[in-house]
Amino acid sequence: TIGVPFFWPSAAMPNTVIDSWSGMVFLKFNGAKFSASDYPVLAKVFPSLVLPEARGDFIRIWDDGRGADGGRELLSWQAATNFSQFAGNIGEGAGHAINFHDGIAGNQPGFSRFNFTSNSVGDGVNFVAVRPRNIAFNFLVRAK
């Protein structure tokens, strides 16, 4: 269906792989502009005439008022966050807390607290980058 995003497991476009799709046109979600006169149905789905830049990013389902990721608009981009903890003086042992709130109050959905055990002593702020396991696919849309 024109305008519906989908994942594709090949660098080759679907119309070059599947004979029955040879008359179709597919575009990547790579931030490119497109023409409403060339792709009028796609222009109804993406009236900005620009496909979102999604290369290397994870898709997140829209919050739509739930409160777990409040204030987000559809197709908006969001930077990564880090787990962080201020460590005025961390001693060895268990029970150190990392608060991961991403701007969310402690009594709201989405606020999390993680405990960890330290094997060393130190000062400052520790940051840990987190990336879930993943697999790379092409992210495409049928344009015609």
For the regions a protein language model found, what residue spans apply to each?
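Low-complexity Ser/Thr/Gly/Asn-rich repetitive segments
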Residues: T1-K144
